[in-house]
Amino acid sequence: MKILFCDVLLLSLLSSVFSSCPRDCLTCQEKLHPAPDSFNLKTCILQCEEKVFPRPLWTVCTKVMASGSGQLSPADPELVSAALYQPKASEMQHLKRMPRVRSLVQVRDAEPGADAEPGADAEPGADDAEEVEQKQLQKRFGGFTGARKSARKLANQKRFSEFMRQYLVLSMQSSQRRRTLHQNGNV
């Protein structure tokens, strides 16, 4: 069992060493000299192997590799800085939670070769269904909070009116006692 595990480990290491994507990404990283946090080697390798879409980082690397000089032209730093920014996983999770962004991501994933606006090819019926769903959620949520708010307001009014009634009754009783005591001459 140990021999089999060692063989698999050795083969995986050899395949990663002899593949061109890691070597190309390392070369690209050396030629670009980016900030340590801006260049993600794993992302570059995945983009090279075409497992991740879109591939802005790998596009810049192919241009650098094709130039061969290792120096970028003065117009390229903007392209490099835009390509080196990769959204974090937490940012992507937050974006995917939003329904509109999720639909745009799904459209983009469905048509990887399309450069047109992502929402332009979507079916109009899908947007209508999504809007109806959002309105229903808004109505339900708004109605729920509205009902609680009005119920709370009514309960506060009832509580206050009950308090006022008790206060008035007690004050009337005490004033009657005073009058009675005053009339009897006990005061």
Swiss-Prot record:
The keyword Phosphoprotein does not apply. GO terms for cellular component: extracellular region; synaptic membrane. Residues 20-95, 180-187 form a propeptide. Specific enzymatic cleavages at paired basic residues probably yield other active peptides besides nociceptin. Residues 109-126 are annotated as: 3 X 6 AA tandem repeats of D-A-E-P-G-A. Brain and spinal cord. Low levels in kidney and spleen. Sequence repeats lie at residues 109-114, 115-120, 121-126. One of its GO terms (molecular function) is opioid peptide activity. Its main location: secreted. It is found in: Secreted. Residues 109-133 are annotated as: Disordered. Residues 1-19 form the signal peptide. InterPro entries: Nociceptin, Opioid_neupept. It holds the Pfam family Opiods_neuropep. One of its GO terms (biological process) is neuropeptide signaling pathway. Belongs to the opioid neuropeptide precursor family. This is Prepronociceptin. The gene is Pnoc.
